[in-house]
Amino acid sequence: MKPGYHDIYTRYRDNITRGVLKPGDKVPAIRVLAEELKVARKTVETAYAILTGEGYLVSQGARGTRVNPDLLLPDNNAPAEQPTGTLPASLISQRERAGFLRPGIPALDSFPYKKWLLLAGQATRAMRQEEMLNPPVLGWYPLRQAIASYLNISRGLSCTAEQVLITSGYSGSLRLILDTLASRSDKVVFEDPGYFMGQQLLKRIVPRLHTVPVDRCGIDTDYLLRHHRDARFAIITPSHQSPLAVTLSLPRKQQLLDWANQNEAWIIEDDYDGEFHYTRKVLPSLKSLDQHDRVIFMGTFSKTIMPSLRMGYVVMPASTVGAFTDCADITTSGQPVLTQKILTAFLNEGHFFRHLKKMRALYQTRRDWMIAALREVYGDLFFTEQNDGGMHIVAFLTKGSCDREVARCWQEQQLQVNALSEWYRGSGKRYGLVMGYNNVRSYQEALELLERPKRQTLALLN
């Protein structure tokens, strides 16, 4: 029986993790391996794409494809390093490491690679000469139309294609919004805890950055009104807060909208994990409740499709389209038209909706595996709060505050979790591990992964 792409992927992954294939080793060319295994080239392409996406392989152009030279594999016989307090740097570099349980990574084994490759081929063959010039800074218009249609249907927005601006992702969107509308004297508030990479970016570009606590109902709007009523921008994740996974309550949504309208402030709504709710319908966005056009909505395709796509969007309030256009002309160079054409076809032909529906069911199953495995391996050392969706869980420590040390132990075992306390800037910290689960393929695999750092974890927490 001929191997499928998942069989090829599994063989290479296992050989790499066991050390049979070492960092820097060259792997066969796609054509050569396809001929040897007597399978279609697309089968090998798909397997290699998953391995590359997970960081096991790197493509080096004419030099071929190799096992990632920077791959860190666990050495179970090596003595554990002592914590050095440098976890924030490791959180940043984690995005480029291979490993498991990394938050925010979609299920790479379940993406419709063959369909995507087919659309890529069609888009490439259909490229016109004029599309090979500089891309439009606001984005390829058919993609802007497709995104507007998707947001109108699934997120309850009432927007036109003219209000949609295509960006390079989260950082590109946030930079462009602030470059367009903010001055250096403006006060900006951010959730605490809040998205770690967002914090790092804002600390570099916003002189007056302040935080507002988050509780079980989302960002504390009473605190915002007491301490930061004069803020010009509030950056929030109302649908699925990052990282605590709570949903902003309806009374607080209305309170936030009233504040923005009365003070001519802007709310930047980051639709973090907004597509992934498992036990109820996808919630309408905060923007859909906005009667005064004070909400700037932003999202990406990093979690719904793949991180390497580097494609995001901003829904501009109608009154700001001119300002955004002028700023984008100066500060951005547009996104590749070919990639935008592939994504447009993926949306317009219904593949995106079908993929999301499949992923919601799959992620709910994999989340349940991870929570059950965590309980079986660690008993009551961790606890989780049942939330309705998202792409990660927070395993809170039941005692102690050494989540940095625990996270470091797990990272040494190739488990790329985050320490929750690193996502806080103010007081009132909670302690635990932020972990992804989307690429855990079975309950048994979840158990095996969690067993890796068990000895060191028990030593720290008991």
What is the role of each PLM region?
Residues 1-123, 319, 325, 329-336, ...:
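N-terminal basic, amphipathic alpha-helical segments
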Residues 62, 288-323:
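Active-site PLP attachment segment
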Residues 101, 167, 212, 298, ...:
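Hydrophobic residues at beta-strand termini and immediately following loops
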Residues 130-263, 274-276, 281-289, 293, ...:
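Conserved core of the PLP fold type I
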Residues 147, 313, 341-349:
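Helix-loop "lid/cap" segments that line or gate small-molecule binding pockets
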